[in-house]
Amino acid sequence: MSRTGTTVEIRDLIYLSEEGAPPRRLDVHRPAADRPVGPSVLLWHGIGPDEKDVLAPLAREIASHGLPVLVPDWRSDAPDGGRSHLMASLRYVRDHAVEFGGDGGRVVLAGWSAGAGAAMGLALRPGATEGVRVIAAVGVAGRYDLPARSTGTAPLADLDSTEAGAGAGAGAVPVTLVHGAADSVLSSSHSRDFGAALRTKGWPVTSLEPASDHAGVIMTEYDPARGLCVPSTSEHVLRAGRETAAAIVSAARTV
């Protein structure tokens, strides 16, 4: 899968303003060169509040393949667990993606760690996307037996719901699951188990286990002094992150 060249970054666009609260912001990573309008990628970070910067290396890599990527801050410590932030960012992509060369009517929803569960929650409950058309969902290093921040219910439990059952089969949102084989934060068994459950219900699933850990699959490494993931220059980490990016790009282009 070839890259298209350099990328452009637009930082700290406001996607949600709430009275009495700081504005919620997002970053856009897009190809520098003009291209035909294609799918847009909405990429959600994990449980750490307002950590969009953590996903910048992965977002740049995806954008280098020709897709606009929008990465919002959101707060898991909000009273609703972050749901209003996540949903507002989804609506923002629908309404504004065209400004960055993307199609707001074709959204690839991807998330890492807690963001993965949030993405899968909406993939299984298309009626909860507020009219936004999600064409593919990608979960990276996620856990799916806990309530998703986007829906309040566990994706694994949602598989038995009437809505998920109606969405399975030919019309199902294709799912891609990426999980580092050496992940010691969230075992890759979570993705394997979820993938198996999806397949049992007739869901189209692609699974990938790069030789990496929880941070490496997004081109980062954990810095204990700072308490967060930071960009890595290690070749094996970059290789794993490129696999993740390629999986997201493939999900966008095979729909």
Question: What kind of region is each of these model predictions?
Answer:
Residues M1-P36:
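N-terminal cap/lid segment of alpha/beta-hydrolase-fold proteins
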Residues P36-G46:
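Short beta-strand element of the alpha/beta-hydrolase
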Residues G48-R60, W74, S189-H190:
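The serine-hydrolase catalytic nucleophile loop
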Residues S64-P79:
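Conserved alpha/beta-hydrolase
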Residues R91-D158:
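Primarily recognizes the serine-hydrolase "nucleophile elbow" in alpha/beta-hydrolase
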Residues G171, L177-H179, D183:
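Short beta-strand/loop motif that positions the catalytic acidic residue
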Residues K201-V255:
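C-terminal catalytic histidine-bearing segment of alpha/beta-hydrolase fold enzymes
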